[in-house]
Amino acid sequence: MKNIPEVKVGIVAVSRNCFPELLAVNRRKALVEQYIAKYGENDIYECPICIVESELHMARALNNVIKEGCNALCVFLGNFGPEISETMLADCFDGPVMFCAAAEETQEDLLDGRGDAYCGLLNASYALNLRKTKAYIPENPVGDAEECADMIHSFIPIARAIVGLHNLKIISFGPRPSNFLACNAPIQALYDLHVEIEENSELDLLESFQKHNCDQRIDGVVEEMKSELGVGNTIPDILPKLAQYEITLSDWIRTHKGNRKYVSLTTKCWPAFQTMFGFVPCYVNSRLTAKGYPVACEVDIYGALSEFVGTCISEDVVTLLDINNTVPKDMFNQQIRGKTFVEGEYALSDLFMGFHCGNTSACKISSCKMCNQRIMARFLPPEVTKGTIEGDLVPGKTTIFRLQSTSDSKLRAYIAQGEILPVATRSYGSIGIFAIREMNRFYRHVLIEKNYPHHAAILFDHYGKSLYEVFKYLGVPVGDIDYNRKRNNYYPTENPFID
């Protein structure tokens, strides 16, 4: 994927002047050796400058990691550490920063070999707060060389999302459909996140689409589509128009991203789109998303934002689905009740179907097929509703989440992990049966209670750990990062007297 950053973490050791500098240097070397042995050398850079309680050392280390192309930073306390210069480094570095610290290695060397980084990290946290400087501190931030290497590796997807957002432009084509308040998108919070937004009209897109009529690249894209769809290419006559639209959006990305490095899109697909363009855009949305350019439906700007975050963290294809409908009791009784899945058995109250008309990439659908958009075809001529890619989602672990601004421009988020069940939905669209523990309570006391839109970003594995840290780093209050609580862990609005 070319539309997400490559992260290079500069590792800078720091030392208190009353502790041996060599202790911090040797611990840094051991950490780097462990990292390279487990994960390779491409993601990190070992800064040769150890900061020993000196602002001049700090400036030299800062210039060194910048010169070496580092866009993320690990401040490694090899001993107690100098809280002024080490946090000044974090404050001056323009990118995501983490702190971790060295544990004592052996009982045989607790005289000159004792570093007291466990204590020093407390001072570092205090100084970071004084400077109002953000930093990622792992759950267990003090460890041996291998454990600190693992911490840095866990930091990389977090850093990738932060760096990506600081260089992101969301391109939208709207306005949102009438009678669709759910996709209200106050843009102040985007600027608070350093995300750029370019809002265009549907008419701008139509004009550009028409200018791409008879584009010489159309035939090549059609062949790509035929190859991807295979036996699912049931409406071949629509492919040239879809190819023309894909080229239109691709060119718009190229010519409009400006000084930003990464792009996410959100477009309209109703009510006038079908009749004016002559198709529905779902399949094209899915193809661009598979190429690393997430496209959210229905002018869902924060859906596009969430999909991009998910793409950065997972380095995989994402999708955007409605939290859509319940699972019928007869389906549950015949296909799900009493059966053991990846994460065990499920109750009916844990289940829902996630659906969208046909925007999920072919690689995430068990068996895809080109179709008419069934809902639109109920009131429009069938010939203008072609263009959805339909099929049941690939089963396996999943994460549903959303980063959203409230109407008064406050950020909040939710995350829930579960699985997509290997059970046929017997329905239409890009669709799957989702199993999320205690989903009924999560639905009522998070999604409804906090007025979330019905769109959720979908990842095809468990990424809650990284998402939670990204949202904290972005400044979402921890009380507004919701998740599906376990039984007997009540939500603030939950009635404790209900059986």
Residue ranges and their predicted role:
Residues H57-C70, E86-L89, T248-G258:
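Short, well-structured alpha-helical segments in soluble
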Residues N372-D499:
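Extended hydrophobic packing segments that form well-structured cores
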Residues G220-I313:
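Long, internal scaffold/assembly segments composed of regular secondary structure
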Residues M88-G115, L122-A127, K134, S286-V299:
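Short, acidic/small-residue loops that bind anionic groups at enzyme active sites
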Residues K2-V9, D43, E105-N233, I238:
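Cap/lid and interdomain-hinge subdomains that line or gate substrate/regulatory clefts
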Residues C70-N79, M98-C100, Y262-T267:
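Periplasmic-binding protein-like
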Residues M1-A37:
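N-terminal basic/disordered segments at the start of proteins
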Residues T289-T425:
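C-terminal catalytic subdomain
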